[in-house]
């Protein structure tokens, strides 16, 4: 059974910061806290529209992280150039649409083999490990192995969004079979998208899983578990000012 790691995605710390155009909350500080709590790596998605994580965040995180930086990005010339210059430990190549709220599905590696092969070679030559974010589909897994990616990240969105227990169980079987197939080809298997405190255990139990990348659920839980202390501290400061 593979060692299981947690990559914490801090994109939505940046979402909250950017909503008001302030300097806080700082994703860099959030990354430090996540590492102290046991995160094995920090994941950030530098989108083309910079809707949350910024170039500044990527640069400082690369310089300050104690663990590993996983940079999610689209396969564009701009992003490849940034990755080669920044040299994160990992790059996870993802599909990207400007109008989407979050990544909606996996890469079509099979339909763009040359483009993906070129991107993988360029990143590998820069000393960066690569994963490809794909659906739990054998054709895509085979293509990922063929273009030179040592890792895949299985898109767990359909599992997370399942409306019934039966549908979720079916998706779980599909993911487990995909993980076994990928491992048989020599690929290391990560997974992510939509994983929460309620649905993570079944995915974590899949023996081939190497790392789970989880963000929104953790940030959402942090708001709730930290809200009591945050309100109490503000009230304390106000009363202290009045003597």
From Swiss-Prot:
One of its GO terms (cellular component) is cytosol. Its EC number is 2.6.99.2. Keywords: Cytoplasm, Pyridoxine biosynthesis, Transferase. One of its GO terms (molecular function) is pyridoxine 5'-phosphate synthase activity. Disulfide bonds: none annotated. One of its GO terms (biological process) is pyridoxine biosynthetic process. This is Pyridoxine 5'-phosphate synthase. It comes from Shigella sonnei (strain Ss046). The gene is pdxJ.
């Amino acid at each position: 059974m593979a060692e299981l790691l947690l990559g914490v995605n801090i994109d939505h710390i940046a979402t909250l910061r950017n909503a008001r155009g302030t300097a806080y909350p700082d994703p860099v500080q959030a990354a430090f806290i996540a590492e102290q709590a046991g995160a094995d790596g920090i994941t950030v998605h530098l989108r083309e529209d910079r809707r949350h994580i910024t170039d500044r965040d990527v640069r400082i995180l690369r310089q300050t992280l104690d663990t590993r930086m996983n940079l999610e990005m689209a396969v564009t010339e701009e992003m490849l150039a940034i990755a080669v210059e920044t040299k994160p430990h990992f790059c996870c190549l993802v599909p990207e649409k400007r109008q989407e709220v979050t990544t909606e599905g996996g890469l079509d590696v099979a339909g763009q083999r040359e483009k993906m092969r070129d991107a993988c070679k360029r990143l590998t030559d820069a000393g960066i490990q690569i994963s490809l974010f794909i659906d739990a589909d054998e054709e895509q897994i085979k293509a990922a192995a063929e273009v030179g990616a040592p890792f895949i990240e299985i898109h767990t969105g359909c599992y997370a969004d399942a409306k019934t227990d039966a549908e979720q169980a079916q998706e779980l079987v599909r993911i487990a079979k995909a993980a076994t197939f990928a491992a048989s080809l020599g690929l290391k298997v990560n997974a992510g998208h939509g994983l929460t405190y309620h649905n993570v255990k079944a995915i974590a139990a899949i023996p081939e899983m190497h790392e789970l990348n989880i963000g929104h659920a953790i940030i959402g839980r942090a708001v709730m578990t930290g809200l009591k202390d945050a309100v109490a501290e503000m009230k304390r400061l106000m009363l202290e000012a009045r003597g």
